[in-house]
């Protein structure tokens, strides 16, 4: 056990002894997400570095405090990537972090479970987690899964960490499956109203086309094709529309992924004056939702961002009626909880899981479920 891990173990043992709670953080770039952070800060940025990387095996293992940008740069050198496009939120949302923030970390990426524009075609964070080392509430270091897909021992436990918001323990190390960067990528822009855009993107999604990502906002549908050059060219001819220049397209998708584009910048400003940014997960073919406020659609219509002042109950009811759920992504008032209320049986399972890993409730209380 090195000094960085020993320091974290000591803090967990101290918190357990004095019955305090801990706020696990790396870059603190997702402090706005989920319930409000409370407790003594537990900084994991000392747990940094790529432990092992086997490009030929498409597997990388990194410590939890490793900057996400550092990991992705190492993968890019070998022509590989995290295909689910984890967002890089760069603004420190907690004043205690200050200018020394490293941006998002690998552990935070897994704990938040957020994925970018390609999620609908390649899967999410949990689909790429092969194994993990977790420090539980008893200050015990547990290992789950492995570094190859065929090693299934503990595999599901590792995947459970994705989206857990840190309530199960400190993610000390993660093994991830990576993939080669697609040989060809092309972005198209097509004018379409929301209903037509939903229909068309789902029609194309049901065909053997290399459709990697989509986004609709303000009457414009943007599509990304990725794969073999011949397949990308053939799909572009079939779909039509305006081809977006490569640099401009890359900036668009990065801005969408990192919430730096016009829609999300405007939403962040609106939140400061009392609006809320909601993320609704619904079946992709769901018709346009009749809700006030600006909307941006991703994932073929399966993910719908809405910036509105409408009551939380109205958003949750609309999502539920469509067969989905709503998450309060950004907003000042999270008294009712950021995430959709779970069915009693699922809430019970979650609490029992938390009790098994963190019996004293040390880690990130209230970030996932209201206390």
Predicted regions and their residues:
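FAD-binding subdomain of flavoenzyme oxidoreductases
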Residues: 94-214, 220-221
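Terminal amphipathic helices with adjacent charged low-complexity linkers/tails
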Residues: 224, 228-249
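Conserved glycine-rich FAD pyrophosphate-binding loop
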Residues: 35-37, 92-96, 244-371
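Residue-level signal for inorganic ion chemistry
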Residues: 26, 223, 306
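N-terminal accessory segments
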Residues: 1-29, 319-341
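N-terminal glycine-rich flavin-associated loop
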Residues: 1-22, 44-98, 110, 114-147, ...
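Short beta-strand
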Residues: 23-24, 212-217, 295-299, 328
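Helix N-cap motif at beta-to-alpha junctions
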Residues: 193-196, 225-232, 283-286, 308-313
């Amino acid at each position: 056990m090195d000094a960085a891990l020993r320091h974290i173990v000591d803090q967990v043992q101290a918190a357990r002894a004095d019955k305090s709670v801990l706020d696990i953080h790396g870059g603190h770039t997702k402090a706005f997400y989920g319930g409000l952070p409370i407790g003594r800060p537990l900084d994991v940025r000392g747990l940094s570095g790529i432990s092992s990387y086997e490009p030929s095996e498409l597997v990388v293992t990194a410590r939890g405090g490793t900057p996400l940008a550092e990991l992705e740069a190492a993968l890019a050198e070998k022509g590989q990537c995290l295909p689910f496009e984890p967002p890089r939120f760069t603004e420190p949302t907690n004043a205690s972090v200050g200018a020394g923030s490293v941006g998002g970390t690998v552990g935070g990426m897994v704990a938040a479970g957020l994925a970018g524009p390609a999620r609908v075609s390649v899967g999410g964070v949990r689909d790429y987690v092969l194994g993990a080392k977790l420090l539980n509430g008893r200050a015990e270091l547990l290992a789950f899964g492995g570094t190859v897909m065929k090693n299934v021992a503990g595999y599901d436990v590792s995947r459970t960490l994705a989206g857990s918001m840190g309530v199960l323990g400190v993610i000390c190390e993660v093994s991830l499956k990576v993939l080669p960067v697609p040989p060809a990528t092309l972005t198209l822009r097509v004018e379409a109203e929301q209903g037509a855009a939903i229909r068309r993107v789902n029609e194309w999604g049901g065909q053997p086309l290399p459709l990697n990502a989509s986004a609709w906002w303000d009457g414009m549908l943007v599509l990304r094709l990725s794969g073999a050059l011949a397949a990308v060219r053939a799909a572009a001819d079939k779909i039509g529309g305006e081809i977006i220049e490569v640099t401009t397209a890359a900036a668009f998708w990065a801005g969408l992924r990192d919430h730096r584009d016009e829609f999300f910048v405007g939403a962040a400003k609106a939140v400061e004056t009392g609006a809320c940014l909601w993320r609704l997960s619904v079946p992709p073919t769901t018709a346009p939702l009749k809700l006030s406020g600006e909307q941006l659609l991703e994932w073929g219509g399966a993910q719908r961002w809405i910036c509105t002042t409408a009551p939380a109950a109205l958003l949750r009811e609309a999502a539920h009626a469509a067969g989905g759920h709503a998450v309060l992504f950004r907003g000042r008032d999270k008294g009712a909880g950021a995430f959709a209320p779970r069915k009693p049986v699922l809430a019970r399972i979650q609490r029992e899981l938390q009790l098994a890993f963190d019996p004293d409730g040390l880690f990130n209380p209230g970030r996932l479920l209201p206390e």
